[in-house]
Structures are given as C-alpha cells and as structure tokens.
Amino acid sequence: MLKEAVAYYHELLEDHDLAVESFRVLQEGHEKNRLIFGGRPLSPYLRPHFITAENWSMVQDKCRLIWSALQKVKDAAVLDDELLDELGVTEIEKDLVKIDPGYKQVSPTARLDSFLTGEAYSFVELNGESPAGIAYSDSATEIFRSLPVMQKFEERYALESLEGRPKMLEVLLTCWDEFCGGKAERKPLIAIVDLKGLPTQKEFELFRDYFQSQGCDAVICSPEELEFDGGKLYLGSVAIDVVYKRLLVNEYLPIMNKAPALLDAYRAGAICMVNSFRGKLVHKKAIFAVLTSECYSHLFDKTEIDAINAHIPWTRKFREEKTRRADTPVRMSAEHERFFAATGDADRSVRSPGEIELVEWTRTNSHKLVLKPNDDYGGHGIYIGWNSTAEEWEAAIETALANGDYLVQER
C-alpha cells in the first residue's frame, strides 16, 4: 500500500496549479510556524515521509525492547567503574552521572536514529542527551496537513499525525511527579536551558509557548543567567522547578566553574532536570559496543538480545585488541547459554563466533565499516569506509587510533 500511496502523492503534484499553491503555503508556513533553524527553512520541499501504521507499530515495539536494554546498561554502569570506562565516560563525567536525578529513566527524552527500508529496520546511533527536532516536527506536521496537495491526498488515504510537544510535556510532568515522590501537587515552572545564540532558538520558543498554553509557566534562559541560593534555583526572581536541559554536557563543562548554579542546584536535589547528566551514559556511541558485545549479554533477557541482534549494528571500541566477529550475530556468553538451557529456553540458534584482530580486520573491510568518534554530534569526525580510497581509510585508521576514543561500526 505504501508504494501506491507515494505514487499517488507524486501524481497529484503533476497538477501544476495544485503544486504551485501547495508550495506557496509551505513557504509561508515556515515563518508562521517557526520551522526555522539558524535562519533557514527546515523543510522546503513538498515531500513528506509516509510510514504505514503496521510499520509504525513495529518500530515502537523494537524501540521499547532496545530501550529496556539501555536502561539495564545504565543500572549496571552507575555501580561499575569498569563499565563506565568501557563507555568512555571521563572522570568529571563519572562524578556527574553518579548524582541521583530523582527519577529512574536514564534518558526520558531521546532519539534513536535509524533507517527503515522495505528489507530492514536498523539503528545507527542514539542521541540520549538533548535531542532537537521534537517541536520542529510538530510545526512541519501542521504545515503539511494544511497543504492543498495533502488535503487532496487525504480524500483517498487516512493520515495520522505524530505529536511531539504533548508527549514532551507529559515526560517532564511524569519526571516531576516521580521527583516529588509521586505526590506532585502543582504544575512546575519549567526552564528551557541552553547556551545563547543557538540555531535552535525557534524550537525553544515553540516549546515555551506550548507549555504555557497547557498551564505550565515556562522561561528560556542560559546557565549563566541562573542563581542558586542553596534552596531554590532562580532566573531573576522566578523560582524554577523543572529544567528542560537542552544544554550539552560537553558545552557546559568549559563554563561550569563560572556558571555553577545549575550543577549546584541539581546536586542538591533542588531541581528536577530532564534529561539528567546520566543521559551521557547512553549518549556515548560506545553504548552500541556494549549492547553488541557478548561480554555484557548477561545484562539482557532473550527478547532484548534478539532485538539487539536484529536491529543494532555490530560495534566495537576501536583499539588494538582481539574481539569476536562472525557473519551471523550472537550476543550470549557461555554462562548466559547455560542459563537459558537450564530455564528451558535453549531453542534459539547460536553460532560460535570467530576471533579477529580488530584493527587489521577493519583495515581490510572498509566496504562495510564506518569509524566515528565516541562523543560528538552533527557528523563531525566520521569516516565512511565505502566512500574512502585505501589511502584515505588508512589515514582514518591512524587518526582514530591516535585519538583513542573512536568506534568502528558495521554498515
């Protein structure tokens, strides 16, 4: 059905007048709906992304399983310095992630980046710190639902919009209630906190206006503007209850000493901060190396392991070492196999993985590998093997080894 629906949408755009009018509405909608990133329109084309209800249900099911596994990694990591080291958590970050945020979820608002094709559904990485795009997506939805071409399309096909801001507010209020011991008696004042002058300013405004429309006072501020009196966190005379933290840890660390109020209030348990600093645990790209390593398979149950095998690309920290690799994935240690056998759950197929020299294997398998930094974003520092010459790939390997905090990941 999806192919037929997309073909019909393209057919509608062959109507010149309909396409021109739809494009006009799209262009005008960007400014009106604040679908602007750094001064430029975010979605300037008349091409939405359609997904079937069946596929959407599948995506939700798989995400729930993967998220369950990620939560278990967090639970283990806060008690295990060796696992923190494997994730690439620095000493100062270790101090931050060991502070209890007052709620259980490791990253209440996160984005699992993935590819969905007719053949497979595969995750690429996880933004577990402070993902952008939630409110922007709402704006794009509002604009596209108003297009003449979309209204014509809906005469034949039923559409369901995905709403982000209501769910984001629900997450903040749920964390706030848990933070209050399940006895929150009022709606919190929410501060959206990030550095000044960022291209996502319009999205902050979209969130602020929505929160206010739902009865939650909200402000936008930078960490430098905050003050902590030992009991409450303030923006001027305004007392803050919940911090919707869009500020990245890597951007806060350099200014933490001159803008300590946010950390001091968080450490004192004076604010509910979402996401907490513990989001850094799953934001590290090495989280996929932990998920796909047999060394940590004892953390997960069978359904989680099966989901990891099917949807998480094989990933390793890039270093001089021997590791296991074979054509058919498996994530269970011998101890885990014995456990499943003892519980009558030994029917899953398992292979005996082969051992490889990781660096040399990476050198000879560039056609299916990428090298990426453990803790960066926006595509910085990524080397794509299948787009590289032998010389370029060798240089990438040397760069990654010298850096010491890179991942190698299968395509």
Where are these regions (language model features)?
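Preference for protein termini
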Residues: 1-411
